[in-house]
Amino acid sequence: IMAKEFPEMLVGAGTVLTTEQVDRAVNAGAKFIVSPGLNPTVVKYCVDKGIPVTPGTSNPSDVEMAISLGLDVVKFFPAEQAGGINMIKAMAAPYTNMKFMPTGGINASNLKSYLDFPKIIACGGSWMVKDALINGGEFEKIKEMTKEAVDIVK
């Protein structure tokens, strides 16, 4: 619905675990896929179909697998629990062409520390859009928290 209502918006799908979910997401208008882990079957499927994919990684072996599959961007998940920005910096050192998109534990207080590192292309965070806020129809609060995140990035 979002992709149809707002065609200028880049809409993707997250927590994609299977090729069937890839197909459903793309058919619903997703332009890119993000997954919590590196499933070679899902990555190859996306690459073969020309669908941008960002699989989750949390160690050098995952990064090397991503490189072998032709990727140069990975999700680092769960970021804070897996060592945060210091772990990303350590992993980025030998993999000079790799870029990272951390998610998991990112919030308004640590967002800038991630985005200040040049190897970070984006951060994901659910702190702005909690289920309770959505279910409660608290869209002004979501708007306020989203604006706060944008202001941090400026």
What are these regions (language model features)?
Residues 49, 60-74, 84-94:
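Anionic-ligand binding region
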Residues 1-59:
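Glycine/small-residue-rich loop that forms an oxyanion/phosphate-binding "nest" at active or ligand-binding sites
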Residues 46-51, 132-154:
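C-terminal helical cap(s) of enzyme catalytic domains, especially alpha/beta-barrels
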Residues 11-14, 33-34, 53-56, 74-76, ...:
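Hydrophobic faces of well-ordered beta-strands that scaffold small-molecule active sites
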Residues 18-28, 61-69, 92, 106-122:
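Catalytic cores of alpha/beta
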